[in-house]
């Protein structure tokens, strides 16, 4: 048996797919993954066949680059859907089920292909701000009508904008393969009941949300840390880690620079993750060390605190490691996870994406306090570690209930 995983998103989304692929492999199920070109090396490491689908995002979104004009945004939006119809049919050949992770627009195309082939379809998204709910508004960088505060209305507007942007391309491509048009484009992409790969302590399922919360899909990372990093860790007290992952755009380099200054003022050493923005150290002093991608599960257990952007992936790894966190949210679901860190008492949520020396100094005082460390370690013991196993069981249970393929 083989299952197709289709991922459209950042490295964190790819890791969600990798965790599920690993669990399915343990159950004797083969997988292949449609994923962005940048995922090639990671998928080769874990032995998952890779079907490149998408654009090299980390090359498109560099620090200081202006956003594309509206017509280019619309072209890219159409491409997101088009690429699924072009690549997924071939990738799904011989597969018994399809799981989409990440971008909802891509998921509408992936589900259409699964529908055509009569395959069970699951959609997975790790954040509640992407699932319509009367309790949480849409992601905070979504455009809204001035003066509208009713959460239900905000979600209705979100669904209408989504349909306007992606519906024409979706329904044109569906017609080409003999499928009827979709009216509720936003709801269609979610599938019959989304899988929610988020930990119930860190991101509890809200009432009235029809989803299956499996717990986080996390692959145990057994890779050793690089020798140079091990030497830096051994040379002094636990440092503070700074990293913004696959975030990019204006202000990240400045935020990292201010963070280094604030950490040094506390008498602490620094580890700086370069990330997609390719951050650089401010100088050549021996109290700072720059790294590329490493085993963060191992590293986070050996640092004094973690300063990060609040993505779902980084948030789950840091929380599971029991390390205090200072979250500087920038967009999408990051303010939600920053708020959860503060609510759980395992760190501090910075007010906005533009830190100052003063704001970070105050936050670090709380983050580095012994009581914050104790609370972070206590919460780490509550985090579920078998989310991918629960998801794999759901997928395999659905394989025997697939619908017949739609005739050409």
Swiss-Prot record:
Annotated residues for binding of devancoaminyl-vancomycin: 76, 80
Catalytic activity of the protein: dTDP-beta-L-vancosamine + devancoaminyl-vancomycin = vancomycin + dTDP + H(+)
Keyword annotations from UniProtKB, A to Z: Antibiotic biosynthesis, Glycosyltransferase, Transferase
Highest taxon in the source lineage: Bacteria
GO molecular function: hexosyltransferase activity; UDP-glycosyltransferase activity
Pathway connected to this protein: Antibiotic biosynthesis; vancomycin biosynthesis
Documented EC number(s): 2.4.1.322
Pfam families for the chain: EryCIII-like_C, Glyco_transf_28
Top-level EC class: transferase
InterPro entries recorded: EryCIII-like_C, Glycosyltransferase_28, GlycoTrans_28_N, UDP_glucos_trans
Binding-site list for dTDP: 10-12, 246, 293-296, 309-314
Binding site for beta-D-glucose: 13, 103
Annotated GO biological process: carbohydrate metabolic process; lipid glycosylation; vancomycin biosynthetic process
Remaining remarks: In A.orientalis different glycosyltransferases are involved in biosynthesis of the vancomycin group of antibiotics. GtfA (AC P96558), GtfB (AC P96559) and GtfC (AC P96560) are involved in biosynthesis of antibiotic chloroeremomycin, while GtfD and GtfE (AC G4V4R9) are involved in biosynthesis of vancomycin.
Protein family: Belongs to the glycosyltransferase 28 family.
Stated role: Catalyzes the attachment of L-vancosamine to a monoglucosylated heptapeptide intermediate during the final stage of glycopeptide antibiotic vancomycin biosynthesis.
Protein name: Devancosaminyl-vancomycin vancosaminetransferase
Source organism of the structure: Amycolatopsis orientalis (Nocardia orientalis)
Gene name linked to the record: gtfD
